[in-house]
């Protein structure tokens, strides 16, 4: 019973951490990263399709992305989707290659991004703590029903606390790494 609870808890905390990391990877840093364009949906023939399914995206250098379109006919649709995105990018195309220059981040924009990153990190920490509280509550309920002993309850709480500490540390490490990326000029 204890290992089942711990495995389930670890799985839930891992999902929270992965979700946080995927959200943060979308935030633009000073360097070109293909994941910046992950959220872009391309409208063509009445359907909305993720850009990644229609093109290959690579970082040419620290300030340019190259989008190689699989089907030449989609180039104007993809270019329009990138222009209309909230990222404020201005692509230029030639045949089936779209170059996306990334303008340097201003100091104010960097500070804004750090605030966003920190709030996302705090939300992830709260989610992990809520999972801990939920598991501790379930553990207390099963103790009241006499399904587990007090020692087992204590062991569950200790192990869940260790998991909580580990995942919060992981979130903090990722936060620190991302803050450094954003502040690097």
Swiss-Prot record:
One of its GO terms (biological process) is cytoplasmic translational termination. Belongs to the RRF family. Responsible for the release of ribosomes from messenger RNA at the termination of protein biosynthesis. May increase the efficiency of translation by recycling ribosomes from one round of translation to another. Keywords: Cytoplasm, Protein biosynthesis. It comes from Hamiltonella defensa subsp. Acyrthosiphon pisum (strain 5AT). This is Ribosome-recycling factor. GO terms for cellular component: cytosol. It comes from the Bacteria. One of its GO terms (molecular function) is ribosomal large subunit binding. InterPro entries: Ribosome_recyc_fac, Ribosome_recyc_fac_dom, RRF_sf. The keyword Metal-binding does not apply. Gene3D superfamilies: 3.30.1360.40, Ribosome-recycling factor (1.10.132.20). The keyword Cytoplasm applies. The gene is frr. It is found in: Cytoplasm.
């Amino acid at each position: 019973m204890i290992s089942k609870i711990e495995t389930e808890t670890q799985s839930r905390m891992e999902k929270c951490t992965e979700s946080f990391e995927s959200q943060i990877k979308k935030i633009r840093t000073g360097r070109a990263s293909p994941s910046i364009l992950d959220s872009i949906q391309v409208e063509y023939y009445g359907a909305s399709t993720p850009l990644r399914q229609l093109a290959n995206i690579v970082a040419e250098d620290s300030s340019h992305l190259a989008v190689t379109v699989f089907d030449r006919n989609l180039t104007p649709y993809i270019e329009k989707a990138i222009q209309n995105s909230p990222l404020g990018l201005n692509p230029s195309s030639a045949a089936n290659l779209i170059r996306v220059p990334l303008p340097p981040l201003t100091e104010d924009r960097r500070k804004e991004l750090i605030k966003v990153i920190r709030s996302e990190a705090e939300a992830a920490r709260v989610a992990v703590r809520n999972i801990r509280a939920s598991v501790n509550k379930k553990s207390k309920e099963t103790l009241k029903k006499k399904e587990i002993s007090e020692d087992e309850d204590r062991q569950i709480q200790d192990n869940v606390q260790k998991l909580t500490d580990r995942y919060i540390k992981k979130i903090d490490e990722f936060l620190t790494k991302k803050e450094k990326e954003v502040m690097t000029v």
